[in-house]
Swiss-Prot record:
GO molecular function: small ribosomal subunit rRNA binding; structural constituent of ribosome
PANTHER family: 30S RIBOSOMAL PROTEIN S18, SMALL RIBOSOMAL SUBUNIT PROTEIN BS18A
Biological role stated in the UniProt entry: Binds as a heterodimer with protein bS6 to the central domain of the 16S rRNA, where it helps stabilize the platform of the 30S subunit.
Presence of the UniProt keyword rRNA-binding in the record: yes
PROSITE patterns noted in UniProt: RIBOSOMAL_S18
Gene Ontology CC entries for this record: cytosolic small ribosomal subunit
Subunit structure: Part of the 30S ribosomal subunit. Forms a tight heterodimer with protein bS6.
Keywords, in A-Z order: Ribonucleoprotein, Ribosomal protein, RNA-binding, rRNA-binding
Family in the record: Belongs to the bacterial ribosomal protein bS18 family.
Record-annotated disulphide pairs: none
Keyword rRNA-binding among UniProt keywords: yes
Name of the protein described by the UniProt record: Small ribosomal subunit protein bS18A
Amino acid sequence: MPKPPLRDKVMKKKICIFCKEKNTQINYKDTTLLRKYVSDRGKIRARRVTGNCVQHQRDVAIAVKNSREVALLPYATVAR
C-alpha cells in the first residue's frame, strides 16, 4: 500500500510586526492597532495566527485586557 503524499505547500513563518518595526508601541489606548488582534467574537487571537513573538503577544493581551477594562474595546460582540 503506497504512502499518502506529503504536503506540497510549506507554510511560511510569520514575522512579529513589533520586532520588525522597532518604533511601534503597544498601548491600550490605540484601539485601531488592538482591533487587529481581537476576533469578531471578541476573543484575543492566538500567537500562531497573528505571528507575534512571545513577549509581544503577552503585551498585546495585557493591552487588550486594559482597554476592555476602561471600555475602549468591548468584551464580546453580539453572536446572533
